[in-house]
C-alpha cells in the first residue's frame, strides 16, 4: 500500500513537472552552495597560509615549513581546479538556458508541421474514398 502511494506521488510529480525543473532548481542551488563552500574554504586556507608566511618571514625560514607550505599551496590549487569545474558547469547551464526558448519554438514548429502534414494526408485519404 505504501509502495503504491509512493509510486502514485512520484507519477504525479512527473505529470506536474515533466521537464523536472524542480530537480534542476535543486541541483543548481546545491551547485551554488558547493561553490560558496569552496570559496570560503579557499579564503580560509589562503588567509592561514599568508599568516604563516608572514610569521616565517619575521622569525626565519625553515626548509620543512617551506615544504609544508608548498604542499598546502598545491592543495589550494586542487580546490581552485574543483571550483573552476563548478564554474564550467554553471557556464554549461547558462548555455542550455539561453537557447531553451529557441529550441522549444523549433519543437513547436516541427510539431505543427507534422500535424499539418498528417491532417492533409488524412483529408486526401478521405477524399479518395
Curated annotation (Swiss-Prot):
Q: Name one GO biological process term.
A: regulation of protein localization
Q: Which UniProt keywords are given for this protein, alphabetically ordered?
A: Cytoplasm, Transport
Compartment annotation: Cytoplasm
Q: Which domain of life is it from?
A: Eukaryota
Instruction: List cellular component terms (GO).
Output: BLOC-1 complex; endosome
Q: What residue stretch is flagged as signal peptide?
A: none
Presence of the UniProt keyword Transport in the record: yes
> What is said about its interaction partners and assembly?
Component of the biogenesis of lysosome-related organelles complex-1 (BLOC-1).
Family stated for the protein in its record: Belongs to the BLOC1S4 family.
Q: What does this protein do?
A: Component of the biogenesis of lysosome-related organelles complex-1 (BLOC-1), a complex that is involved in endosomal cargo sorting.
What is the name listed in the Swiss-Prot or TrEMBL entry for this protein? Biogenesis of lysosome-related organelles complex 1 subunit CNL1
Q: Which species?
A: Eremothecium gossypii (strain ATCC 10895 / CBS 109.51 / FGSC 9923 / NRRL Y-1056) (Yeast)
